[in-house]
């Protein structure tokens, strides 16, 4: 109860609703646009790997890959939008006593709602057409951990971008390298041992691996390592958020 009151969750929900309404205002297709982008990306990769390169993917592989692409799209969209959290809401932060965490939760819920609805629809369609099976425990574990990470992405990157505007450009330019260093279109077992440390240094590798494990069998030691690293990355982002809150909050508000 105290956490809900402290973060003003009712306000966060209202802001998330407003964000969604504003995003699709005047759009004929509305919510369908949130499905179209990752779907086009999935079909492009499917054509390249399955048809041109003739990689022997099973129906389960194809279904898992489709859902991982949707998961990645959610992460990429959150990363891109996180840098504008403070600058895009400076009118609220400078005039209304609203916590940065409340704005972050609102933004996260807005993106998550689109991802989750689209993802559930895809799971249902793929399960019927391709016979996809999945582990709901790992699925919701991946989503829960990712939600915690993304909230701190918003508060940390959004705050730092006020002082260092290059961050927003760095995030956009590094999205493709980060994607290619994430085991989304390939499996961890296919990576040469000398290249594995580089892949594990990617913060998103562990989260994508846990999500992928919900739809595709992954070696147990990779799964345990992924969960451990995911918790570690969340803890690191939480500490960075606390440092910013303690050391830079006044300067942050003065800079708006």
Please annotate each region the language model reported.
Residues 1-256:
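Hydrophobic transmembrane alpha-helices and immediately adjacent juxtamembrane helices
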């Amino acid at each position: 109860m105290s956490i809900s009151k402290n973060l003003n969750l009712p306000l966060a929900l209202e802001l998330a609703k407003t964000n969604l309404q504003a995003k699709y205002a005047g759009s004929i297709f509305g919510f369908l646009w949130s499905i179209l982008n990752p779907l086009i990306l999935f079909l492009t990769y499917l054509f390249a790997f399955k048809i041109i390169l003739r990689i022997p993917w099973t129906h389960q592989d194809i279904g898992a890959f489709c859902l991982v692409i949707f998961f990645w799209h959610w992460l990429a969209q959150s990363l891109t939008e996180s840098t504008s959290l403070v600058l895009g809401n400076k009118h609220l932060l400078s005039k209304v006593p609203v916590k940065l965490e409340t704005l972050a939760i609102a933004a996260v819920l807005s993106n998550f709602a689109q991802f989750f609805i689209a993802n559930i629809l895809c799971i249902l369609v793929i399960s019927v057409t391709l016979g996809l099976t999945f582990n709901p425990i790992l699925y919701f574990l991946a989503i829960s951990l990712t939600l915690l990470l993304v909230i701190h992405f918003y508060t940390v990157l959004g705050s730092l971008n006020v002082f260092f505007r290059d961050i927003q450009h760095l995030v956009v330019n590094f999205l493709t390298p980060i994607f290619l260093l994430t085991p989304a279109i390939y499996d961890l077992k296919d990576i040469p041992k000398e290249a594995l440390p580089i892949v594990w240094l990617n913060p998103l590798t562990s989260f994508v691996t846990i999500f992928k494990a919900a739809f595709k069998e992954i070696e147990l030691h990779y799964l345990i390592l992924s969960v451990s690293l995911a918790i570690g990355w969340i803890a690191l982002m939480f500490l960075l958020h606390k440092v910013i809150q303690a050391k830079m909050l006044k300067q942050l508000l003065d800079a708006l």
